[in-house]
């Protein structure tokens, strides 16, 4: 589909939409230096520091899918807007998520938490190369050793739980 021209609704209409309909998003978990054996999994995972939504927390890269935008284009748009143009990655034209995350405005013990809305996050695990330059909502970007991640309280949206589930699938 190529470039997408954003189709915006008024702030008031968007707030009403979020109150009645779940938002579909892409969540991207960058990784590098993956080494896997029968007993161990070594890798680095990239996270952005952002206001989530009001406190600085480590989070996945992502955001909503725009009307008439393919998942491929949404992933590309989010990565470029958040990490800049000097990153490289390989992505199929019709990418399939490694996990489907659910976020609710009410805290639960199991699902993700987003006080702003009910959202469904199509989660992608992408091998990223090149120099990431945080921009947009990213206040910072950092590579973490997969065995030394931030504390659960330092993650936004309860994404530490989602990441734990995904790492068990790999």
Where are these regions (language model features)?
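Acidic, metal-coordinating catalytic segment for phosphate/diphosphate chemistry
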Residues: 1-37, 114
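Conserved Nudix-box catalytic region and its N-terminal flanking loop in Nudix hydrolases
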Residues: 39-86
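NUDIX/MutT-family hydrolases
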Residues: 121-127, 133-169
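Active-site segment of metal-dependent pyrophosphate-handling enzymes
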Residues: 84-131
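Residue-level signal for short segments within beta-strands and strand-turn junctions
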Residues: 30-32, 49, 128, 145
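A structural signal for short, well-ordered beta-strand segments
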Residues: 28, 75, 124-126
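Short, charged/polar surface micro-motifs in flexible loops or helix N-caps
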Residues: 33-37, 53-55, 66, 103-105, ...
């Amino acid at each position: 589909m190529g470039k997408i021209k954003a189709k915006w609704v008024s702030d008031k209409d968007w707030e009403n939409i979020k109150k009645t309909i779940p938002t579909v998003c892409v969540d991207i978990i960058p990784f590098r230096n993956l080494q896997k054996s029968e007993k161990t999994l070594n890798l680095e995972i990239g996270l952005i520091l952002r206001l989530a939504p009001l406190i600085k927390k480590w989070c996945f890269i992502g955001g909503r899918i725009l009307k008439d935008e393919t998942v491929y284009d949404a992933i590309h748009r989010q990565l470029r807007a958040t990490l800049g143009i000097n990153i490289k990655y390989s992505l199929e034209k019709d990418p399939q998520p490694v996990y489907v995350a659910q976020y609710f405005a009410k805290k639960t013990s199991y699902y993700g938490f987003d006080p702003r809305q009910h959202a469904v996050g199509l989660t992608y695990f992408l091998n990223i190369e090149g120099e990431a330059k945080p921009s947009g909502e990213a206040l910072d970007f950092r590579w973490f050793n997969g065995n030394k991640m931030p504390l659960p309280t330092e993650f936004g949206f309860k994404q530490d739980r989602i990441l734990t589930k995904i790492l068990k699938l790999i």
